[in-house]
């Protein structure tokens, strides 16, 4: 890894990270695998709230406390800056032990990478840091009832309100980790079209839609 620019990722450190990831997956996540299948998430139609299976939140809290949510992310935003290959090892262990649980941090990872690459500076400050820290989670909202993942046909619209604010309306389905009680806020990255967008996939834009609104500062 040193030849790839990861000077701190020596053999001793990498081995220690892998060993701890294995311990966490085996002793914390694997025992919850059956519970995830038998109990699953619970939806309360009266409130719209979703609760995760017993033990899932406690496991997620331990995952966050261990710094795993930021393992491969940029240190500028609170990450540890480890190689993506090491993150792949972690993901394989987590998902092998408990795939249902592993879907929660998996979607956050995708949201983090999108914001790192394309987010504005204020978006990185407001949304990226809590996602890397694991105090919030993220999703990717693509699929719609009428077209599945044929994104060229999506109908979700974003109407401009001000120069940097939009009113987003539409219906998304099959959103992994779209609602839960692991953290107080969920950052949804939503694919939608502006009123003057060209037809097809080329007219799609990406919008940051948090479950609860937050101020820039």
Q: Model-derived features: where do they sit?
A:
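Flexible, glycine/threonine-enriched loop-and-boundary segments that flank and lead into catalytic domains
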Residues: 44-61, 65-73, 139-162, 171-180
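Amphipathic, small/basic residue-rich leader segments at the start of a protein or domain
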Residues: 1-103, 122, 126
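Flexible loop/turn segments at secondary-structure boundaries
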Residues: 77-81, 110-114, 122-123, 146-150, ...
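Beta-sheet entry/capping signal
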Residues: 61, 67-70, 100-104, 137-139, ...
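Internal maturation/activation junctions in enzymes
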Residues: 36-37, 44, 104-108, 116-160, ...
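Short, well-ordered loop/turn and helix-capping segments at boundaries between secondary-structure elements
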Residues: 96, 113-121, 133, 137, ...
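A short core secondary-structure module
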Residues: 165, 169-216
């Amino acid at each position: 890894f040193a030849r790839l620019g990861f000077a701190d990722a020596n053999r001793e450190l990498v081995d220690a990270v892998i060993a701890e990831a294995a311990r966490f997956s085996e002793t914390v996540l694997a025992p919850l695998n059956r519970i995830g299948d038998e109990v699953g998430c619970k939806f309360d139609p009266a409130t719209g709230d979703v609760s995760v299976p017993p033990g899932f939140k406690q496991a997620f809290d331990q995952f966050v406390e261990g710094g795993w949510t930021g393992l491969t992310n940029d240190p500028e935003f609170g990450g540890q800056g480890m190689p993506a290959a090491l993150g792949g090892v972690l993901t394989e262990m987590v998902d092998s032990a408990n795939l249902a649980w592993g879907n929660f941090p998996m979607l956050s990872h995708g949201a983090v990478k999108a914001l790192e690459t394309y987010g504005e500076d204020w978006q990185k400050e407001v949304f990226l840091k809590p996602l890397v820290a694991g105090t919030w989670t993220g999703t990717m909202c693509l699929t719609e009832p009428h077209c599945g993942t044929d994104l060229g046909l999506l109908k979700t619209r974003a109407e401009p309100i001000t120069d940097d604010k939009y009113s987003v309306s539409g219906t998304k389905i099959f959103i992994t980790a779209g609602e839960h009680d692991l953290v107080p806020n969920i950052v949804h990255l939503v694919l939608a079209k502006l009123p003057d967008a060209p037809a097809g996939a080329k007219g799609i834009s990406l919008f940051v839609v948090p479950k609860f609104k937050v101020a820039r500062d």
